[in-house]
Amino acid sequence: MTNDMTKGAITPLLIRFTIPLVLGNLFQLTYNAADSIIVGKFVGEEALAAVGTSNPLMTLAILFINGMCLGAGILVSTAFGAGDTRLVERQVSTTAIAGTVFSLAFSALCVILATPLLQLMQVPADILPIAVNYLRIVFAGLIFTFFYNFLAATMRALGDSKSALYFLMISSVLNIGGDLFFVEVLNWGSSGCALSTVISEALCCVLCVLYIRWKVPILQLGRRWLVFDGSLLRKTVSYGWASAMQQATVQLGKIAVQAIVNTMGVSTMAAFTAASRIDDFAYTPQQNIGHAMTTLMAQNRGAGKHDRVKQGFLCGMRIEGVYGVLIAVVCFGGAPFIMKLFVTDPEVIHLGVRFLRTVSLFYLMPAFTNGIQGFFRSVGDLKVTLVSSTINMLFRAAAAAVFVLMWKLEIEALPYSYVVGWVVMLAYELPLLVRYLRSHEDEL
C-alpha cells in the first residue's frame, strides 16, 4: 500500500502521516523501559549494567543503519513523487544489496572484536563476559536489524506510515514476550534478552516481506531487484552519512551534558534522568512532524509541484507551533504529577519539576528547528541539518559547563543550556532558509 502525497489537502495528510510515527516512537520508548525492567528484575543489576554498557556500540551501528535508510528514503520519496517506478526499484535494490554487505561485514567484525572493544570502554571485569555474550548475539542478528529498519523506512517513504507502525508494534510485543520467556522461564539471563531481540526482528522481516508481496506491487521482490547502481549508492551514502553523523552528534552532546550532570549530586542526577525521559516523550513528536514534512515535500518536489512544497512547509510549521504550545502547557502544568510517575523521593520530584517547568517554556524553539530541518532534508541539503545539530550540541554542552562548573548554578542551568543551543541553531538555520526560499522564489 502506498500513499501519494502529491494530491489532497496538505494539513490532514501531514497529521495522518505523523500520528503513526509518533505512536511508533512512543511505543519504542515504552518498550525500551520495559526491556530494562525485565532484565533488572529477573536477572539482576550486573546483567542490567552489562546490557547498558553495550548500548553505545549498538547505538553506533544502528545510527549508521538508520542514516543509510533515511538517505535512501528521501531518494525513494523523490522518485515516487516523480512517478519513476523504475528509479524506485533501482534505489531500493541498490540500498538492499549495499546494506546487506555492510551489515554482514560489520556484524562479523563486532562479533570478533567484542571483547577488546568492551575492554577499551573500561567495562568492569566482573560483567565483561555477560556483556560480550549479549553483544555478540545482538550483532550476529544485525542483518535483521538492517532489513527491518530498511523496509519500514521504504514504506514510510512511499507514504505508508501505518504499516511501519504495525510492524514496530508486532516486533515490540514479540520482543517483550520473548524477554519474559527466555529470561524468566528459561533463565537465560541477558543472553536470552539479546536472542529475543534477534528473533523478533527476524520474524518482523519475514512479515514485512510477505506484506510487501501482498500489498506493495512497486516493491515486489523479483529478479529486477538484483540491480546495483554505483551512482545511486554514492548519493545514498552522501545522504545517509550526513544523517548518521547528525544522530551521532546528538548522542555525543547528550553524553557530554550527562557527564556534567554527574558532578551535581545523586538527587540531581536522578531528577535529570526522570525529567529527560519525560522530555524525550515531549520532544519525539516534534521530530516526527519534521520527518512527515520531509516525506511530503520530497514527494512533491519529485513531482515538480513546488507550490505544494511551500504549502507543506508552512502547514508543517503551523502544526509544529500548535504542538509546541500544547506540550508546553501540559509539561508546565502537569510536571508534579508526571514526575511522581517516575520517582517518589520529594527532593527528586521538586528538582525534576523545576527542570520541566523551565524547559517547557521554550518548547517552540525545537518545534521550529525540527520543521526547518524537515525542509532541508526534503530538498536534499543534509549538510545544513548536520551542521545545525552539531552547533546545537556544542553550544549546549559548553553552556552547561559554564553554568554548572563555573557559575555553580542549580538544575535550571540544564534547560537554560538547551535554550542556548536552540538559539544558536535557529540563528544558523533561519538565514539559510530565507536565502534558499529567495533563490528558489520562482519554484516556490
Segments from the language model and where they lie:
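N-terminal transmembrane alpha-helices
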Residues: M5-F42, P56-G71, L75, T100-S107, ...
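Short alpha-helical transmembrane segments in multi-pass integral membrane proteins
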Residues: M1-T18, V76-G141, V185-W241, M297-F362, ...
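Helix-terminus/linker motif at the lipid-water interface of multi-pass membrane proteins
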Residues: L26, T30-A49, L118-A125, F181-W188, ...
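Interfacial/gating helices of multi-pass transporter permease domains
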Residues: V39-T59, D126-I130, S190-C193, L232-Y239, ...
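Transmembrane helical elements of multi-pass membrane transporters/channels
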Residues: R16-D35, I137, Y148, S171, ...
